Amino acid sequence: METLKKGKKYAIHSLCYLLIILVFIAPIVRLFLMSLKSEEGYSLWNYALLLQEDRTRKAILNTIVIAVGSTAIAAILGSAFAFIIAYTNVRRKRLLELLVLLPFIIPSYIITLSWSSLFSQKGTINQTLSAMGLGKINVYSIAGIILVLGFCNVPIVYMNVIHMLRKIPTDMEWAARTCGYGIGQAMLKINLVQAMPAIISGSILAFLAAIDNFAVPAFLGISSGIPVLSTYIYEKSISFGPNSFSLAATLSVILSVIAVAGTLVEGIFGKKSSGMESIKEDYSVRIPLSSGKRKVLQYGVILFLCIINIVPLISMFTSAFQKNYGVKMTLDQFTTDNFTAIFQNKGVLDAIRNSLMLACGCCIICIVIGTAIAYQKVRHPGRMITLVEKSASLTYAIPGIVLALSMIFHWIEPLPGIRPGIYGTISILMIAYVTRYLILQIKGSATAMLSIHPALEEAAAASGRSVFSVWGKILIPLLIRPVLSSTFMIFVSALTELTLSSMLAAAGTKTIGLMIFNFQQAGDYNLAAAMSVVIVVLVLTGYFLINHKNSEYKKVEERVYESFNRKCNQKVQSNISIGSY
């Protein structure tokens, strides 16, 4: 009997390892092997050939310049906003935080569309500048890409830094003050130094997000002939050259090496700040400003955030209701035909249906599998759980365009002789989405699981409850609020995804992001703007609904704890009564 149990356990473990290798590791290995494949066999010929091309060197240089420039913008603005919101006594902090996080909630290609709408060549701003004898602003340039990417990545640095700032003990500041330091000196000598690992870590994440981003350089760079590695991989993949896929794989490996190296460096700085994870965040005011200074800073920050995050969106909203793109808005120009056109377009309706189906399916799969893995990680850690977490992290760390290409190479024939025929179908998109976003659910569910004491499960099991009852009555009600927060980000990312679908979708499986991209590339800017408006409204509505539901689920958590404590007390009292009897 014991031998049978061991054999069954071994078979289950072997199957799990096989699935991990098949889904996460094998596609990356296939991609690497494809980069070495040439007419003579396996060699470094593809690397030598590509590095000799001027366009390749230009793409690498552009990628580095754009990533460094946008990271500098994100690091400066993200850190500054974090200091202001965490430490000063400015009011409307929830509004300020929403304005800062807006580029994180809205897809980057919609933000790019809004900026291109604001600075269109026939638009009000450029026409005014031209009338004044000044040069027009061109966002279809390296400077434009840097600016838009920098604004898109501000929330990444902000979220990394603000939590660290709130965890720095006030005792350290007061100790510095007693030594004669002023508030400014204490902030520079103590808080800034303590927060530096988080600032560097956030900056590296912003750098990785910049080299991973396909949408911004595709929308602004392809038409103006500015190649970066992500768009260059896309160009090579859709070309029909004899060696196009091998060359695309080679470029993908180069981009992946940069991304993985950055991830490892970020991990080093992340560990330096991980020692403060157990410290509770302090929301007290540390830099009290006078009423006048507070108002100037508060309204100045709100104005600046509105200029970089709201004004471009308003311009895009205006374009969605215009007959002609890029001209001054007048009553003669007002129309709702753009919205009528997109909702009567079968391709658009199919894309919305596909995206909703993929987003919902991806969320359900990630919740079930991700939460199960997180439970095992927290309660029963082991080598298999570590392997699946590392593998899922790898597929999230590499750029999306690289993952998409690896999916093509792998799933055409995942095992020798087996051809599932899923390329160009919803199935390969679903596999790619789950592979891409599973780690977000694992980390979110693991964090939520850590907040639930094992004693709750042990007490429930001791009282005779089944595993299903423990999950249904205790774990799920306590997990649902934090788990839903992670799931919402997966849902929005999957719903508005562009990079994976640009490589994996076919005529009948186009997604929302791909339709907007196609409209923009075809010059149908008004239709792209109209569809983007619909997506922005849907995403923001979902964001506010999730926040509202989170407050309701918090009350449910409190009721679960109260109910459980009451039943435990009754059980104890009952045992005492029986014992005394």
Label every PLM stretch briefly:
Residues I60, G180-Y181, K189:
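Polytopic alpha-helical membrane proteins, predominantly small-molecule transporters/carriers
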Residues K8-E40, Q52-R166, Q194-F214, F219-G221, ...:
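Membrane-water interface segments at the C-terminal ends of transmembrane alpha-helices
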Residues S117, A215-P242, K328-D332, L498-Y525, ...:
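Glycine-rich helix-loop "coupling/hinge" segments at transmembrane-helix boundaries
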Residues E2-L15, R92-K93, I162-R177, I183-G184, ...:
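C-terminal transmembrane helix and the adjacent membrane-cytosol boundary/short C-terminal tail
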Residues Y47, S230, I238, F339-A341, ...:
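P-loop potassium selectivity filter motif centered on the GYG triad
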Residues L36-L44, S120-M132, I222-Y232, S273-E281, ...:
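Peri-membrane helix termini and adjoining interfacial loops of integral membrane proteins
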Residues P288-V296, Q322, T330, F334:
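Extracellular/periplasmic ectodomains of large secreted or surface enzymes and adhesion receptors
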Residues S43-L51, M187, F334-F343:
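A short amphipathic helical element positioned immediately N-terminal to and/or at the very start
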